[in-house]
Amino acid sequence: MLCLPVFITLLLLVSPSAALPVESELQRDLTQDSPKDFRIREPLLLSKMFDRSCCGSSNTGSCCGRYQRGS
């Protein structure tokens, strides 16, 4: 009677799945970037890229007055 619980315990300790970290589907989904997030951030990213190119080394762009204080 004692052999069965000992065998099950040893089997659980030796199994390959015991070495892998447990990661739920929810945790995996929360840590990955989704295409929806990129579509939300894309206009903001494009506006930042445009503002940086507008306020380049010449500082003659019309948007440069807004961003000179922040840089």
Swiss-Prot record:
<keyword id="KW-0027">Amidation</keyword>
<keyword id="KW-1015">Disulfide bond</keyword>
<feature type="signal peptide">
    <location>
        <begin position="1"/>
        <end position="19"/>
    </location>
</feature>
<feature type="modified residue" description="Cysteine amide">
    <location>
        <position position="64"/>
    </location>
</feature>
<dbReference type="GO" id="GO:0005576">
    <property type="term" value="C:extracellular region"/>
</dbReference>
<comment type="similarity">
    <text>Belongs to the conotoxin T superfamily.</text>
</comment>
<keyword id="KW-0732">Signal</keyword>
<protein>
    <recommendedName>
        <fullName>Conotoxin ba5b</fullName>
    </recommendedName>
</protein>
<dbReference type="InterPro" id="IPR031565">
    <property type="entry name" value="T-conotoxin"/>
</dbReference>
<keyword id="KW-0964">Secreted</keyword>
<keyword id="KW-0800">Toxin</keyword>
<feature type="propeptide">
    <location>
        <begin position="66"/>
        <end position="71"/>
    </location>
</feature>
<feature type="disulfide bond">
    <location>
        <begin position="54"/>
        <end position="63"/>
    </location>
</feature>
<feature type="propeptide">
    <location>
        <begin position="20"/>
        <end position="52"/>
    </location>
</feature>
<dbReference type="GO" id="GO:0090729">
    <property type="term" value="F:toxin activity"/>
</dbReference>
<dbReference type="Pfam" id="PF16981">
    <property type="entry name" value="Chi-conotoxin"/>
</dbReference>
<feature type="disulfide bond">
    <location>
        <begin position="55"/>
        <end position="64"/>
    </location>
</feature>
